[in-house]
Regions:
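Alpha-helical assembly-interface signal, strongest on the long, hydrophobic N-terminal helix that forms
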Residues: 1-60
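Short amphipathic secondary-structure patches
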Residues: 37-98, 133-134
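Short Pro/Gly-enriched coil loops immediately N-terminal to beta-strands
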Residues: 35, 95, 120-123
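Low-complexity, S/T/G/P-rich flexible repeat/linker segments used as non-globular hinges
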Residues: 101-134
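Short, solvent-exposed coil/turn segments
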Residues: 1, 14, 86-88, 120-122
Length: 134
């Protein structure tokens, strides 16, 4: 009984950690897909300003992220890339999202005293695609 009492909390913490990092990975996948959707819109020949950001934010909402409105989406439409002497113009869409662990951060606040422990972390995903107007 003593062994169970000592190992069960550790085993539960490891199990919860696996679920938490799985949730973080799933959130990062939604961010990556949102950046790709925004980049697909941004590289079109008749691009209208603001539509790439709107499309990425729409994907975040459809991905059912909590507080999807707190994500920031930025577009850099004129990134020049040189490969083997050839230059191509690309667009880069970057999505930043404040991710809050549900269990691990409150546990960390109990164990380690400090102002920065337990706050949200920023997950970042970006996508770069060649502009089709060339």
């Amino acid at each position: 009984i003593l062994e169970t009492a000592m190992t069960l909390p550790l085993l539960l913490l490891v199990t919860i950690g696996i679920f938490e990092f799985g949730r973080a990975f799933q959130t990062w996948q939604v961010l990556t897909n949102a950046a790709r959707e925004g980049a697909r819109v941004a590289v079109l020949p008749n691009y209208v300003a603001g539509t790439a950001e709107a499309r990425a934010k729409q994907y975040l909402v459809s991905g059912q992220l909590p507080n999807a409105g707190s994500a920031t989406v930025t577009l850099d439409p004129t990134v020049n890339v040189s490969i083997g002497g050839a230059t191509a113009s690309t667009s880069v869409v970057t999505v930043n999202y404040p991710f809050q662990f549900m269990v691990l951060q409150p546990v960390a606040r109990l164990v380690v005293k400090g102002a920065t422990v337990g706050g949200p972390i920023t997950l970042t995903a970006s996508a770069q695609m060649r502009n089709e107007s060339q």
